[in-house]
């Protein structure tokens, strides 16, 4: 009796197959469009960064799972302007209006941890719900004056 049940089960599994028949498809590219309008301005409190929220993936579909923006900074030493310095994560700005009908279009962050006479470079990446990051934005540079 057991061999008959096992054989019947195997026949059922073989007849069902595994998935839809057809040509294989490459996974969809679900990366947000790159932020291209990052700006940096000096304020009394530090350096203000502003940028626009991306609304689409690179393939043109509407962006639906944006959760935050990752801000990266590097400090350029006045004594070694050409030294290779890596970008370091500075902070994360959360997107809290994903379920709202009208979403925020512009974002702003003020970096208060800056020193006078230092040069800083910044870039921003969009972060999706799965933790993946977009390509970095345009790079902005600012020298903090006294």
Model-derived features with residue positions:
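Bacterial N-terminal signal peptides that target proteins for export
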Residues: 1-7
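Processing junctions and N-termini across compartments
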Residues: 9-12
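C-terminal motif of bacterial Sec signal peptides marking the signal peptidase cleavage site
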Residues: 14-17
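Pro/Thr/Ser/Gly-rich low-complexity, intrinsically disordered linker/stalk tracts
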Residues: 19-65, 116, 131-146
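Recognizes extended acidic, P/S/T-rich segments that occur
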Residues: 52-53, 63-117, 132-136
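Surface-exposed loop/turn motifs at beta-strand-loop junctions within extracellular Ig-like
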Residues: 126-130
